[in-house]
């Protein structure tokens, strides 16, 4: 018989098969036709991934059935799942994992049955049989987990023609789900639907319960005219606003919509797109702003000002600017006056090179300040390397040179093997595989060369997600230094880090050697969750003690708090939760101990085991 195999690119392959063919045979036929190795193929039918050893007839695949071919991407990745309580779970997945697999992993971690889980990404509810790569979910993406509440309800949707549609929904349904149900009933594509409740337009990624829509509520359906689209507006605080617009809307209209949402008067708004400030009378389509484009909103500080730009030839240019202008805007104004392309301009103020995306007010540039304009020469440049002895070496380099290349040049000049060199710039240790331009090292920058003492060593830091980070340290490094290195690698602020070794929390001012941490030791990194919580500890006498703790506290810390309150030495305490004895080096969050949980304290008898 014939069956069809559809790829993600939309191509359909026709195969001659027998009902008794195994999935392995089918993959071999696909390899013959398309050259795709079987171990990179995943076949899906009726939402299920097919197993190699089963046959077509096992899956009731009949003539002219269509299978879906998904390529298994090499390599695992981490993703995050955020619950409505704000808790974030980290999962190890592959792009080829199905949503069903992901729900099973969540069940393993959190105990929530898959049939009560609904996963949302980019405002869409994810279907069990599809894969992460189908939804373009990449490493470090965040999914949202919504629990499916038992028991549905009816709501009504009223159209502009006066017709009322009845829908069966759940409070946890997203607006997108509701639009899909309307499409099923009425045939109106979701992208032409706008739903209004209590005077508010409802956003696709939100749920009915977010809007407090209850049973027998009535929504109003307005059809979105062709050409309607969503755009995003990002403020300097990092907040992103979503707007419904048409390509023919003027910038003035857009500012009015922002005023409706955020209360900012239009005359205080400046909108930037592709580095350009947008003019009120022009339209979105004039600027080629398309659906899902992001504009940047800068607040116009009252009153413009003049600044001066001095070139290396001694010429001074006067510019009219606002504190909220970006450096990119300033370079555009210089281009207008002097004809110098922005990519050849480097602006310096107070000895610092200014970055395009920052504003004048970010750098505290005030009226009548003077900037210095340096032309960016094509090609090579000189940099300096300063050693701890105070000697300065001059090197000829290119921005595209790697740190490894630079170390080789230092070896040529000074004879120091690269593996004994550590280069520091702007307080950061530079990694071999990165380039000078990655670190924004420009001509006449100064790097600092530190020799890697033979006491240098590697240690490992293990996070609660199971990820292990490798750090280059010295025994004399303080815990504060180690936290700074973790921040460089992982972006976690030191004040949110707690490091544990041998069951003890490490103090910032102490050194690794104080704690006898040697090469290849493993530290445990616990995130200090914002805000503590209370838990209760019940003794066998029936007395209940209340403790102030953090989810990241170790059991050892908790025992120390009990000792402070009750005078019982930690080595005589045994703590029980959910029938399990708790181990000293683990944290409260490891055991899913949440606020107002009750632990049981049992005294360890002398001589006992």
Curated annotation (Swiss-Prot):
Protein name, entry field: Polyubiquitin-C
Name of the encoding gene: UBC
A GO molecular-function annotation: ubiquitin protein ligase binding
Record-level GO BP terms: modification-dependent protein catabolic process; protein ubiquitination
Presence of keyword Membrane: yes
Domain Ubiquitin-like: 1-76, 77-152, 153-228, 229-304, 305-380, 381-456, 457-532, 533-608
GO cellular component assignments: cytoplasm; mitochondrial outer membrane; nucleus
The organism's place on the tree of life at top rank: Eukaryota
Modified positions (Phosphoserine) in chain numbering: 65
């Amino acid at each position: 018989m014939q069956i069809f195999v559809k790829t993600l690119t939309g191509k359909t392959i026709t195969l001659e098969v027998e009902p008794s063919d195994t999935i392995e045979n089918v993959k071999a036929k696909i390899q013959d036709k398309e050259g795709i190795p079987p171990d990179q193929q995943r076949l899906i039918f009726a939402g299920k991934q097919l197993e190699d050893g089963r046959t077509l007839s096992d899956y009731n695949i009949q003539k002219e059935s269509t299978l879906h071919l998904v390529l298994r991407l090499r390599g695992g990745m981490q993703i995050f799942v955020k619950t409505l309580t704000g808790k974030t779970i980290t999962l190890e997945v592959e792009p080829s994992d199905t949503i069903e697999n992901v729900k099973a992993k969540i069940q393993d971690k959190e105990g929530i049955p898959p049939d009560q889980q609904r996963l949302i990404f980019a405002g869409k509810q994810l279907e069990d049989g599809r894969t992460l790569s189908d939804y373009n979910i990449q490493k470090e993406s965040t999914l949202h987990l919504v629990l499916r509440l038992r028991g549905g309800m009816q709501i009504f949707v009223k159209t502009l023609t006066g017709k009322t549609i009845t829908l069966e929904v759940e409070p946890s349904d997203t607006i997108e789900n509701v639009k899909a149900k309307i499409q099923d009933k009425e045939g109106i594509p979701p992208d032409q639907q706008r739903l209004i409740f209590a005077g508010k337009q409802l956003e696709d990624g939100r749920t009915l319960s977010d809007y407090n829509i209850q049973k027998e509520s009535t929504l109003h359906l307005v059809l979105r005219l062709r050409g309607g689209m969503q755009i995003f507006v990002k403020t300097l605080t990092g907040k992103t606003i979503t707007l419904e617009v048409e390509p023919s809307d003027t910038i003035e209209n857009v500012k009015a919509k922002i005023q409706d949402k955020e209360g900012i008067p239009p005359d205080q708004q400046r909108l930037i797109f592709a580095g350009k400030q947008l003019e009120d009378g022009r339209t979105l389509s004039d600027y080629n702003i398309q659906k899902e484009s992001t504009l940047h909103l800068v607040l116009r500080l009252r009153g413009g000002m003049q600044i001066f730009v001095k070139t290396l030839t001694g010429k001074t240019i006067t510019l009219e600017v606002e504190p909220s202008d970006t450096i990119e805007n300033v370079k555009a104004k210089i281009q207008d006056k002097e004809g110098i392309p922005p990519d050849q301009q480097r602006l310096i103020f107070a000895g610092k090179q200014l970055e395009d995306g920052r504003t004048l007010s970010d750098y505290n540039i005030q009226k009548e300040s003077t900037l210095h304009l340096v032309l960016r020469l094509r090609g090579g440049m000189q940099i300096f390397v300063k050693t701890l002895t105070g000697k300065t070496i001059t090197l000829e380099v290119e921005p595209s040179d790697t740190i490894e290349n630079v170390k080789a040049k230092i070896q040529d000049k000074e004879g120091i093997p690269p593996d004994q060199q550590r280069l520091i710039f702007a307080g950061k240790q530079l990694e071999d595989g990165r380039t000078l331009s990655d670190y924004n090292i420009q001509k006449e920058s100064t790097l600092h060369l530190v020799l890697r003492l033979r006491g240098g060593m590697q240690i490992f830091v293990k996070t609660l997600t199971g990820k292990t980070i490798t750090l280059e340290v010295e025994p004399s490094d303080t815990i504060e230094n180690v936290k700074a290195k973790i921040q460089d690698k992982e972006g976690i602020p030191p004040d949110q880090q707690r490091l544990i070794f041998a069951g003890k929390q490490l103090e910032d001012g102490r050194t690794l050697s104080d704690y006898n941490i040697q090469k290849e030791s493993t530290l445990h990194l616990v995130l200090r969750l914002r805000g503590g919580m209370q838990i209760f500890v019940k003794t066998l006498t029936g007395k209940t003690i209340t403790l102030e703790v953090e989810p990241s506290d170790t059991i050892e810390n908790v025992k120390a708090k009990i000792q402070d309150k009750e005078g019982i030495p930690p080595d005589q305490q045994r703590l029980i939760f959910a029938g399990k004895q708790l181990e000293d080096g683990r944290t409260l969050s490891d055991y899913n101990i949440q606020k107002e949980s009750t632990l049981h304290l049992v005294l360890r008898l002398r001589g006992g085991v």
